[in-house]
From Swiss-Prot:
Belongs to the thiolase-like superfamily. Thiolase family. One of its GO terms (cellular component) is cytosol. This is 3-ketoacyl-CoA thiolase. It is found in: Cytoplasm. CDD domains: thiolase (cd00751). It catalyses: an acyl-CoA + acetyl-CoA = a 3-oxoacyl-CoA + CoA. The active site is at C99 (acyl-thioester intermediate), H392 (proton acceptor), C422 (proton acceptor).
Length: 436
């Protein structure tokens, strides 16, 4: 094992995560229909600051992410600063790392804290799958640009006369990987076939996720970390995730048809995470700054790792690559963990990564490591359910996982937790957290 890389400032301060909050997550076109991601981000950051009672000028940086970009608000981070009453001089910039976007935001704030350029910052992300940037065809886009430069009405009419009816149709956002043309679900199907993951195994994991999430809500475990929201026309509050199917049975999952490989597939809408709207954020500080403000941190960031693999085959294996690296940098092994939380993009992807984490052959032949990362104990794995149940607003999921894991560690008396996610482009992310 290589030497651990401690995440501390020059003064030896640990990186503290003081608090975290999210909106309830809503299925596409339901509770947050028509609410853009920037407004969801303002909601969660505004409420997070109000609850924390931290002086507004104490926050020196905000790093926020958005995967489904909105052309009218390209820097969502700065818009949140301007729309929440934060100090207008607060540094703010936006990041995007697909489904690991808020992992990246947290890492960036941590690096600013370690560099000593700030003492407190906010990291997070928001996405809306209900407010989408609907584009135009390439032919129409070219004519619009050329028409803007045309000098006469006749020239403009000539340009538009070249268009066909199909050129006028709206173009929805791409759902496939740009470099391969493969959808995420196609990759999940690849992984199910490569690693021999059955439909029954996938449905069982999805059912487990929903049951555990429903239980977490019923026991009040999420109440402190999920805000109540009010959206136009402001008649009814929205306080709980609306994707969780607590009353479902395994027989219900078996009824659905494959969504991607219609003939031979096993990936369905029920064993995949749905399109979702929501936002999440965390407040981060140096340990000494938290003490100055009289705050007890939720926990600390012990290590993080980002990895990348090829996109043509089984590209959602990021957790199998990033987990051993994050553990190594933390100076820990799988056995040292109290909790292990993995983003469930698809049940097939989740099960494939779990399989490879325990594989000696994968460790030796692919990772070049002497031994497997380690089997994940089911008693430590996604103990409150995962993304299949809660939903997945792309840029918000990492911050949700971090906050949720730290709260659960505190309930268990402290310890170490690892959160990890796959992401489009063959990317992976993992972070080791510590609570006392």
């Amino acid at each position: 094992m290589r030497q651990a890389l401690p995440l501390v400032t020059r003064q030896g301060d640990r990186i503290a995560i003081v608090s975290g909050l999210r909106t309830p997550f809503a299925r596409q076109a339901t509770a947050f229909h028509g609410i853009p991601a920037v407004d969801l981000g303002k909601m969660v950051v505004g409420e997070l600051l109000a609850r924390s009672e931290i002086p507004a000028d104490a926050i020196e940086q905000l790093v926020f992410g958005q995967v489904v970009q909105m052309p009218e608000a390209p820097n969502i981070a700065r818009e949140i600063v301007l729309g929440t009453g934060m100090n207008v001089h607060t540094d703010a910039y936006s990041v995007s790392r697909a489904c690991a976007t808020s992992f990246q935001a947290v890492a960036n704030v941590a690096e600013s804290l370690m560099a000593g350029t700030i003492r407190a910052g906010i990291a997070g992300g928001a996405d809306s799958s209900s407010v989408l940037p609907i584009g135009v065809s390439k032919a129409l886009a070219r004519v619009l640009v050329d028409g803007n430069k045309a000098r006469t009405t006749r020239q403009r009419l000539t340009l538009f006369s070249r268009l066909r009816l199909r050129d006028l149709l709206p173009v929805p956002p791409a759902v496939a990987e740009y470099s391969t043309g493969l959808r995420m679900g196609d990759t999940a199907e690849q992984m199910a076939k490569t690693y021999g993951i059955t439909r029954e195994q996938q449905d069982a994991l999805a059912h487990r996720s929903h049951q555990r999430a429903a239980q977490a809500w019923a026991e009040g475990k999420l109440a402190e970390e999920v805000m109540t929201t009010y959206v136009p026309p402001y008649k009814n509050p929205f306080a709980e995730d609306n994707n969780i199917r607590g009353a479902s049975t395994l027989a219900d999952y078996a009824k659905l048809r494959p969504a991607f490989d219609r003939k031979h597939g096993s990936v369905t809408a029920a064993n995949s995470t749905p399109l979702t709207d929501g936002a999440a954020a965390v407040i981060m500080m140096t340990e000494s700054r938290a003490k100055e403000l009289g705050l007890r941190p939720l926990g600390y960031l012990r290590s993080y790792a980002f990895t990348a693999i090829d996109v043509w085959q089984d590209m959602l294996l990021g957790p199998a690559w990033s987990t051993p690296l994050a553990l190594e940098r933390a100076g820990l092994t799988m056995a040292d963990l109290t909790l292990f939380d993995m983003h469930e993009a698809f049940a097939a992807q989740t099960l494939a990564n779990l399989q490879l984490l325990g594989s000696e052959r994968f460790a030796r032949e692919v990772l070049g490591r002497a031994q497997a990362t380690g089997e994940v104990d089911d008693a430590k794995f996604n103990v409150l359910g995962g993304s299949i149940a809660y939903g997945h607003p792309f840029a918000a999921t990492g911050a949700r996982m971090i906050t949720q894991t730290l709260h659960e560690l505190r309930r268990r008396g402290g310890g170490f937790g690892l959160v990890t996610a796959c992401a489009a482009g063959g990317l992976g992310a993992a972070m080791v957290l510590e609570a006392e």
